Amino acid sequence: MNLVDEVAKGRDLQEQATDMPGPPADRPGEHPGGAGQGAARPAPAGQPAGAAEVPPAVAAAEAPRPPAKPGKLRELLYVTLPGCWGALIVGCLSFTPSLLPRDGIIQGLIWGITAAIGYGLGVLAAWIWRAFADRDARHPRRRSWTAFLIGAAVLVVVSFGLGQYWQYQIRKLMGVTGYNIAFVVVSPLIAALIFCLILLIGRGLRGLYRWVAQLLHRWIGQRAARAVAWIVVAGLVYLVNAGLLFHGFVNVANAAFSVRNTTTPAGVHQSTTSLRSGGPGSFIPWATLGRQGRSFIGTGPSADDIEKFTRHRAMEPIRAYAGLASATDAQSQAALAVQDLQREGGFQRKNLLVVTTTGSGWVDPALVDSFEYLSGGDAATVSIQYSYLPSWISYLVDQSKAREAGTALFDAVYGRWSQLPPGQRPRLFVAGESLGSFGGEAAFSGEYGLSLTAGTLFAGPPNFNTLFREFSDHRDPGSPEVQPVFQDGRIVRFADDPSTGVPPAGQPWQGSRILYMMHPSDPVVWWSPHLIFSEPGWISQRPGQDVLAGMFWIPFVTFWQVTADLPFSTGVPPGHGHTYSTEYVDGCNTVLRPPGFTSEDLASLRKIITRDG
């Protein structure tokens, strides 16, 4: 029996009770024992004298009845009409486009989360309205539920269809061909499961709150008990998430990726040249480099490869790297890497690149390969590992390690570099991608600190990067957030694709060049907790070239959409999302300023980098 039928049955019982006479003892004049007992009772206050007294049973039947309390199981599954309207509206808004294409599984996840948020907002709105209206909750009529079901059917179908159209447009914009219709079909089921799970968790927390409040009410007042209960439950939720669940997740991730760090990628072999760490004469054993360190050291273009591209005599590039197992802390790793770099002759090369890795210790091969090709092999690159966790986990746990590693490595290199005679110093460059740019920035206090180098290249900077945010927030009036202009581009500039130009066009860019590469569709660049409650400029202003013009900001919804984009930011073709492989050729060319390369040469190098990547 559904809830509407139960309410109708209750009304029938009320009508039957109205026709029943009261007990004989409740009728005036029928009490035995004399006139005193049989005399009519005084009329209640507000009731005219002589008016017939309403029997208690009838009065009870005619009085407004509160909604019947369901059983414990039904209470867990019980939903309110205002909450359902909120879930419907907010859930349907989740189909609006975000930065990247998403399959049915991710759409179902976002749908379920946002619907649960909408349900909570609907319940909260109804509670506030009742508080101002000074009325109790009432069961909705059958026709109200009927109207909701009809509206839900229409809205879900329309939203689902529009969502598929928008996803098609995004895939077309980025050149994504993969599409699994099965995932789309199961998305409503996933959404329902996520919604029910969140709803049950919320009901469980509500039950815990009530139990704590009742327990405390034995010793303190009701209002105080409720307030303390809220504090207790909120604190418990925080401790469980930040303590038990978070640390448990990190420990499991550490255990899993620490094992992976001991492996070596297929096709990578220990270097046989003394110009690489882990090779003959190196101070750093091959086994201590870690998986990504061995990949960085064991790959890259040879002198012959570079000569084929430049058609000039080339040098064998130098690479130095220290893994987590190479030393006990970041400072020791940096000192060891610089010692090995000096042994290899890195400070005698014309160009020296300091790279801060991503969370896993990864150095984008497109970055270093482009640097080595464009410098004719007269280059040395040094880096250290500070974690073996992927960047999306390192965002949560390794931000301080990234800053420490970036500062330690640059300080160690700069300390040795500054001891050389000015005429014998290599040109010093700094680079980093994603969390590596966050760590790379840590060694500098601002644009003038960065200008100590010959050039800087950061790709896909996270939104929380200190200097990136400073430059973007103080951009020149009229420049959009997706491509800001800072102080007329005197030192710092931003570009989506350097091959198409680095604004502002026509302005001088002398001395040190600091270039940030960022795609309008890169969720790493734009994700921020502020998306929950405030609209960012990159949405309110004109969109970038690979973002749909129909994207707009919705409280709560946009935050979860961009959050869901993060793990898949590298799963799109180059030139979009968090994939910068082909942009590194033109980025390095912009910062290095090597002579003699034509646009055809750069196009040829982009093909080489794409092939080798």
Annotate the PLM regions.
Residues 2-5, 435, 523:
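Conformational gate/switch positions in structured elements
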Residues 70-426, 446-613:
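C-terminal His-loop and adjacent cap/lid subdomain of alpha/beta-hydrolase
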Residues 437-448:
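Short glycine-enriched nucleophile-adjacent loop
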